[in-house]
């Protein structure tokens, strides 16, 4: 392999050179092509941005194709019209040039398409009218004159060679004749007939009127449908006279007189052929104009003044369809100088746009009100609805309510007079009858004053309604009735003890406790006694408000309940119980395990000594704790009836938490002397161990069947309570009190023991109550509480009997077994029979 390079060196080098040359050529070609394409694209985009055409470099790529040869829409005939429908008008369009658009669009919409060109000088000549075939309804020739120099146009008349005919457009789709003029061709000067010149020239004021709105100054159109049907042999002739000097008069006007000069007598073809028109040399080339062949429609025009109506012929709708094409060449030479003289001066128009007045066509029957410019304020005033001003003094007075005065001023004056008279007179010391009489007098005077100010019509109405003083709220008011009943109570009146409440309280039996006095019930709204007739008037209310203190002193005790109340009946029933108050009841309620013989509700009120000791215990509870352990008898059997109504412990028991067990044991060895004998108090037993709290689902159960001594150590919040002695203090203090009484102490003690034995004999043995578990099960089964959720099963640990590695199926089995709640565990076990580990052998 060492001689490989030596043998192939030449071929390798020549191949590399050839490849390099070809690659260079290709790269160069690609670069040049890309550069050219980029440059052309940049230039084309630049020209597009600047609005220029494509430059020469991009002309070889973008070839502009000529537009397709389509027919000119302006040469088409109008579309067919339904019977009974008016044809629409097409808007005329003018060619583009240096002349303003207003000057190029002033030809009638009924003329055929006419083109003017310097390159095609064709002079139309009038020949035999029968030589021209009639294809479409002949349009009415239009003659436009806009030059102010009428004599020059008349002198430049071209001669029309007889025997020739008008050329017809060679366009395949155009059936309307077209006239191609290179220069203006004026009409021949010919004397018109008598009928044509007799009052058929339009009023000069009509031509010079430019104050009409722009919308109504449009081109004139004449219905030519009847012309074609009545005169089919008339040649289609078009005479167009463009302005000779466009710059001098850029706003050409249409001469209406040329349309109005018509005659009833037809003109012979020989007279038309004999006319000679000279062809003048125009100073300015004519602007090519294009018009549409359209049938007329009803156009709204402004109604002409009376003078213009008189100038127009009345027989125009009957004469024009028959004689217009024949008479127009005859009447035009005489009418044109007059029309040009009227339109010689240019009209001042805004924005370089002029308008031409439009005459009403014979078929139009509708008119539109022209727009008249007004200022915004004037327009608002004109559009505002005018309301006639009504004289208020001529209107009758409105009706007055029978329970009201006719004027509010009279009411206020009467009220002021009442207040003034009441303030001046010492009405507070008067009786209700006197104050009522004074108020009635002031009412009469105020009413008289108010009626004196009224008009005679008002006084007549008030006299018809009734007398001044007797005109009350409704009906007649009797001022002689004694009005001495008390006023109604105030809404914010405090609860005071009325004499009726005092009598009821004195007649009732005294309460057991001094703090259980019943609260006075709220007063009901007082109502009128049915024995007295109800008298409603505003006068007593005013007196009662002013003399409130004096009236309250004279108020007699009155019941809050409607109807007559007998105060002689003795009311001896007990007052209603006080509303429940937790703070007072907890401090005043008897202890939970008080023996039944001390209950005052069954065996009468307790002795005063017990009440005193109960009060003293509630105040000085801690020093008396050792004496609670002293007892003559063992603790009584637990009564289940007390546990059903558990009460909150006294407020003094909260202080017992600070006491230690040593102080209780130290006082346990004390002795008590009872009737000369010494009794040693045994030591108290230790408190039983505290039970654990029940779960949350069982705390709502009735747990009164448990040990009361154990449950007493648990408070609502789970705190430990102090150890509770077996006996209450009242049992230990009673012998001490009786021992100090003297000779009667022994008898009292025996009575206490007998009462105690009787109270024990009265109570029956409590019925066998099921245990807590049975009670809770029955409570749960009754549906009052839901059973607790079962405990979660612990995961079953799987221990392998051997140290062999687990196969994949065994691992999946172990994973499934780890889920204790998997119901499909039975189906996953041994799904695949296990095999011995043949790969990992020991």
UniProtKB/Swiss-Prot annotation:
Q: Which Pfam family, just one, is annotated for this protein?
A: AIM3
Alphabetized, the UniProt keywords read: Membrane
Q: Which GO terms describe its cellular component?
A: actin cortical patch; membrane raft
Q: Where in the cell is it found?
A: Membrane raft
Q: Does the keyword Glycoprotein apply?
A: no
Q: Where is the composition biased (Polar residues)?
A: 422-461, 654-665, 731-748
Q: Which intervals carry biased composition (Basic and acidic residues)?
A: 753-766
Q: Name one GO biological process term.
A: barbed-end actin filament capping
Q: Which family does it belong to?
A: Belongs to the AIM3 family.
Q: What is this protein called?
A: Altered inheritance of mitochondria protein 3
Q: Which organism is it from?
A: Lachancea thermotolerans (strain ATCC 56472 / CBS 6340 / NRRL Y-8284)
Q: Gene name?
A: AIM3
């Amino acid at each position: 392999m060492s001689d490989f390079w030596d043998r192939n060196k030449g071929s390798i080098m020549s191949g590399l050179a050839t490849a390099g040359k070809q690659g260079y050529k290709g790269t160069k070609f690609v670069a040049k092509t890309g550069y050219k394409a980029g440059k052309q694209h940049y230039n084309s985009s630049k020209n597009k941005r600047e609005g220029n055409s494509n430059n020469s470099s991009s002309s070889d790529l973008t070839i502009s194709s000529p537009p397709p040869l389509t027919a000119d829409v302006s040469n088409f005939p109008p579309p067919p019209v339904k019977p009974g429908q008016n044809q629409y008008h097409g808007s005329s369009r003018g060619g583009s040039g240096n002349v303003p658009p207003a000057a190029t669009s002033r030809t009638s919409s009924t003329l055929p398409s006419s083109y003017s060109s310097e390159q095609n000088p064709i002079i139309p000549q009038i020949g035999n009218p029968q030589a021209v075939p009639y294809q479409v309804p002949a349009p009415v020739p239009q003659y436009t004159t806009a030059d102010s120099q009428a004599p020059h146009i008349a002198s430049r008349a071209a001669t029309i060679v007889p025997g020739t005919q008008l050329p017809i457009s060679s366009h395949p789709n155009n059936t309307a004749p077209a006239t191609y003029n290179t220069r203006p061709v004026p009409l021949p000067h010919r004397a018109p007939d008598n009928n044509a010149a007799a009052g058929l020239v339009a009023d000069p004021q009509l031509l010079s009127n430019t104050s009409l709105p722009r919308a109504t100054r449009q081109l004139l159109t004449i219905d030519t449908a009847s012309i074609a049907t009545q005169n089919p042999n008339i040649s289609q002739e078009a005479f167009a006279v463009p302005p000779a000097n466009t710059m001098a008069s850029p706003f050409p006007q249409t001469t209406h007189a040329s349309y109005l000069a018509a005659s009833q007598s037809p003109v012979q073809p020989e007279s038309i052929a004999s006319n000679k028109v000279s062809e003048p040399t125009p100073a300015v080339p004519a602007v090519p104009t294009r018009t549409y062949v359209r049938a007329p429609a009803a156009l709204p025009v402004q109604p002409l003044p009376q003078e213009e109506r008189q100038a127009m012929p009345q027989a125009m709708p009957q004469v024009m369809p028959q004689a217009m094409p024949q008479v127009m060449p005859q009447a035009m030479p005489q009418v044109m100088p007059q029309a040009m003289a009227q339109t010689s001066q240019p009209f001042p128009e805004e924005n370089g746009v002029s308008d031409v007045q439009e005459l009403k066509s014979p078929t139009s029957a509708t008119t539109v009100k022209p727009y008249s410019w007004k200022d915004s304020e004037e327009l608002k005033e004109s559009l505002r609805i005018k309301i006639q001003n009504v004289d208020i003094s001529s209107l009758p007075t409105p009706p007055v309510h029978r329970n009201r005065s006719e004027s509010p001023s009279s009411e206020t004056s009467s009220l002021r007079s009442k207040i003034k008279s009441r303030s001046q007179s010492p009405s507070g010391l008067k009786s209700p009858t006197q104050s009522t009489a004074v108020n009635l007098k002031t009412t009469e005077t105020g009413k008289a004053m108010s009626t004196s100010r009224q008009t005679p019509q008002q006084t007549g109405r008030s006299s018809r309604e009734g007398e001044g003083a007797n005109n009350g709220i409704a009906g007649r008011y009797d001022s002689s009735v004694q009005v001495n009943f008390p006023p109604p109570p105030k809404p914010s009146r405090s609860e005071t003890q009325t004499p009726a409440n005092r009598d009821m309280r004195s007649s009732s039996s005294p309460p057991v406790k001094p703090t259980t006095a019943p609260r006075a019930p709220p007063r009901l709204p007082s109502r009128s006694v049915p024995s007295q007739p109800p008298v409603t008037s505003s006068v007593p209310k005013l007196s009662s408000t002013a003399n409130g203190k004096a009236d309250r002193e004279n108020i007699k005790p009155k019941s809050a309940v409607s109807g007559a109340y007998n105060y002689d009946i003795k009311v001896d029933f007990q007052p209603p119980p006080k509303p429940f108050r937790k703070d007072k009841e907890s401090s005043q309620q008897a202890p939970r395990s008080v023996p039944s013989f001390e209950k005052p509700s069954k065996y009468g009120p307790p002795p005063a000594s017990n009440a005193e000791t109960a009060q003293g215990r509630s105040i000085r509870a801690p020093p008396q704790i050792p004496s609670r352990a002293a007892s003559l008898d063992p603790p009584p059997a637990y009564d289940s009836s007390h546990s059903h109504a558990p009460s909150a412990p006294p407020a003094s028991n909260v202080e017992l938490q600070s006491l230690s067990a040593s102080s209780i044991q130290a006082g346990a060895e004390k002795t008590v002397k009872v009737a000369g004998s010494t009794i040693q108090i045994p030591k108290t037993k230790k408190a039983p161990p505290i039970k654990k709290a029940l779960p949350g689902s069982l705390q709502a159960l009735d747990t009164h069947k448990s040990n009361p001594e154990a449950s007493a150590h648990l408070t609502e919040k789970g705190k430990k309570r102090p150890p509770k002695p077996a006996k209450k203090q009242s049992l230990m203090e009673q012998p001490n009190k009786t021992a100090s009484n003297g000779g009667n102490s022994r008898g009292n003690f025996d009575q206490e023991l007998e009462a105690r034995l009787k109270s024990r004999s009265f109570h029956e043995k409590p019925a066998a109550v099921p245990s807590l578990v049975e009670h809770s099960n029955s409570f749960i089964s009754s549906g009052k509480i839901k059973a607790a959720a079962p405990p979660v099963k612990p995961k079953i640990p799987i221990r392998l009997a051997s140290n062999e590695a687990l196969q994949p199926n065994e691992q999946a089995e172990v994973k499934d077994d780890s889920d204790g709640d998997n119901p499909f565990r039975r189906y996953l076990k041994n799904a695949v029979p296990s095999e011995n580990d043949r790969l990992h052998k020991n």
